[in-house]
Amino acid sequence: MNQTELLHVNFPHLRELKPFDTAHSATPWLADSDAKHSRKLCASIEEAVRRSGLQDGMTISFHHAFREGDRVINTVVALLARMGFKNLTLASSSLMTCNDALIEHIASGVIARIYTSGMRGKLADAISHGLMDEPVQIHSHGGRVKLLQDGELNIDVAFLGVPCSDEFGNANGTHGKSCCGSLGYAMVDAHFARKVVLLTEALVPFPNMPASLVQDQVDYIVQVESVGDPAKISVGAARVTSNPRELMIARYAADVIEHSGYFKPGFSMQTGSGAAATACTRFMEEKMERSGVKARFALGGITGSLVDLHEKGLIEKLLDTQCFDGQAAASLARNPNHVEISTNVYANPGSKAASCDQLDVVILSALEIDVDFNVNVITGSDGVMRGASGGHCDVAAAANLTIVVAPLLRSRIPTVVKRVTTRLTPGESIDVLVTDHGIAVNPARPEIRERLMEAGLKVVDINALYERAISLTGVPKPIDFTDKIVGVIRYRDGSVIDTVRQVKE
């Protein structure tokens, strides 16, 4: 009887212990000089898919750090279609106009279910008109992490595009040919996925540091020609505006911040992804320099404008879950106080601490806002999905002052309405609406209203803005929907705050 067998006899609770075999019995690759370093490398995406164990009915995930420049989602799903996969759940952190190619793979049954922060373009239009049998689950950035944490969403294989990685899987978005900057979305997928496949443009020597995605999270690595076009990150929702009306609204929003009571040394802010929201940053610079007020940090999607303020010493730290342009991506590589964070650290209501809980001021956009301050950023005036939840309801709930910026009208369609088509962020989370026709303050914040009026800002009742809008356009004709639910709007805690119904033909 050997020593291990004696242990089994004398200590029954140790029966699972095994006797020593060889030094490499548990790590056979260490006995192979090639496999020791290259065992994760795959010659093709197809090889990585086969090694991952992906099967019909499983869940695949992607990140959208390249936004409209992404080349991974369409490439991988097209391959899975050729390989014969069916009934998959697609869990991308968001979907863009560039993902219209998914329509054929939904129609053919390759993709049966979708979890996403949002969608745009022909894909969103097709789904809004009933393309899918199951409704799309639309979550916030923080809410996505909570769905993973709670076990409703389980990622079987994550396909994560990165500009560079070493042969063990240490990867970042700040080096290589196609720098996208922060990999805040991908960090969550790498943590929760059963298997992680990296698609990398460059294979660089070990150790590739700093590592946003770490070697102990990565299973397989495929070198590909391109994962994305970083030049297309700052288009669409993340574009920079020169529109005079949007700039005027941005200036008004900066005035609101200045006189809100929160504009003081050490304040914190997030400026969102909409054109007027991002433009607000440049007007804040002028006010900060004039008053000598410096911000402790800025959070969220980071823009070149925020980088400028950081490098001028006006913002101490940048906490970055997504870079909205090349300037931000370059800053992340060189500025030690420009720090990458995951969406879990950013805004997960189920995390042990979310950075958004430290926010003083946030500027957000809206497709619609109603007289009860409920906000819609998902469906357009035609009822078609054309936006994304993003971090909207996350930061709106957490910040001390939540400001929504929007024009009163868009193409003769009212933005201020009696009731939003789709409710994403509840009115209780919205404090101020800034439009080109005036500023409305939620009645729950009378102290803010008083401060703004004392400063001489044009404060009006939100009902007056609604009346002004319909006096210019008339009351919009109600949208015709069928009874079929095509989208489920999940609040950040996972609850259902609204649904989207199919648009009638």
Residue ranges and their predicted role:
Residues M1-E505:
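Conserved alpha/beta enzyme-core scaffold
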